[in-house]
Amino acid sequence: NTVSSFQVDCFLWHVRKRFADQELGDAPFLDRLRRDQKSLRGRGSTLGLDIETATRAGKQIVERILVEESDEALKMTIVSMPASRYLTDMTLEEMSRDWFMLMPKQKVAGSLCIRMDQAIMDKNIILKANFSVISDRLETLILLRAFTEEGAIVGEISPLPSLPGHTDEDVKNAIGDLIGGLEWNDNTVRVSETLQRFAWRSSNEDGRPLLPPKQKRKMARTIESEV
């Protein structure tokens, strides 16, 4: 159920944190660790549960499972699970950099938050993202950001810590909303090759998204009206 799932997630995060404290984690591992911490705090607040207490309970659940699990069953489980890959357009610095908006606009779409600076006009913009892929489909979006040619961040799509879980279609719709909002101000938006392949296939050869004018106007109005 929801509580036991949260307890197990807390304990597994604790194990991963101990691993990271020994300087054994790579950049994607550390990135997920930091973002999962925010997610757990949000879930704990929503459920009204203390994270330390939940971690202890999660440890007991995991220990009970390990006692009952045979080595052979564990091997079969691992083999049968499809492998996920972590893909990165952005460096750790690009992901963790703070940014500010002169004319902030924000929309919540399901478990995703879309933010953009409406003051940005007549710029060439590229969308970059870090996310995991499983069976050639986007599994989990970690973070998507919109960059100008000068490297300034002007937009972002991020999962809400208190509402975990989204589909590749949710991400694609959010990308469409962000593109529509940026193009409303006569910006030229391109999508990274990685995003084109796994999350946004409606692009021409140079990576520019193909959005009808009516759809662009609708998306821009949607972002503006929901702030």
Swiss-Prot record:
Location (main, coarse): host cell
Region (Disordered) residue spans: 206-227
Keywords assigned: Eukaryotic host gene expression shutoff by virus, Host cytoplasm, Host gene expression shutoff by virus, Host mRNA suppression by virus, Host nucleus, Host-virus interaction, Inhibition of host innate immune response by virus, Inhibition of host interferon signaling pathway by virus, Inhibition of host PKR by virus, Inhibition of host pre-mRNA processing by virus, Inhibition of host RIG-I by virus, Inhibition of host RLR pathway by virus, Interferon antiviral system evasion, RNA-binding, Ubl conjugation, Viral immunoevasion
Residue span of region PABPN1-binding: 220-227
Gene Ontology molecular function terms on file: protein serine/threonine kinase inhibitor activity; RNA binding
Gene3D superfamilies: Influenza virus non-structural protein, effector domain, S15/NS1, RNA-binding
GO CC list: host cell cytoplasm; host cell nucleus
Motif Nuclear export signal: where in chain: 134-143
Any matching Pfam family: Flu_NS1
Modified how: Upon interferon induction, ISGylated via host HERC5; this results in the impairment of NS1 interaction with RNA targets due to its inability to form homodimers and to interact with host EIF2AK2/PKR.
Cellular localisation: Host nucleus; Host cytoplasm
InterPro entries: NS1, NS1A, NS1A_effect_dom-like_sf, uS15_NS1_RNA-bd_sf
CPSF4-binding: region residues: 177-212
Domain of life assignment: Viruses
Example GO BP: symbiont-mediated suppression of host mRNA processing
Motif (Nuclear localization signal) on chain: 31-35
Family: Belongs to the influenza A viruses NS1 family.
The protein's assembly and partners: Homodimer. Interacts with host TRIM25 (via coiled coil); this interaction specifically inhibits TRIM25 multimerization and TRIM25-mediated RIGI CARD ubiquitination. Interacts with human EIF2AK2/PKR, CPSF4, IVNS1ABP and PABPN1.
Domain notes for this protein: The dsRNA-binding region is required for suppression of RNA silencing.
Protein task: Inhibits post-transcriptional processing of cellular pre-mRNA, by binding and inhibiting two cellular proteins that are required for the 3'-end processing of cellular pre-mRNAs: the 30 kDa cleavage and polyadenylation specificity factor/CPSF4 and the poly(A)-binding protein 2/PABPN1. In turn, unprocessed 3' end pre-mRNAs accumulate in the host nucleus and are no longer exported to the cytoplasm. Cellular protein synthesis is thereby shut off very early after virus infection.
Name of the protein this chain belongs to: Non-structural protein 1
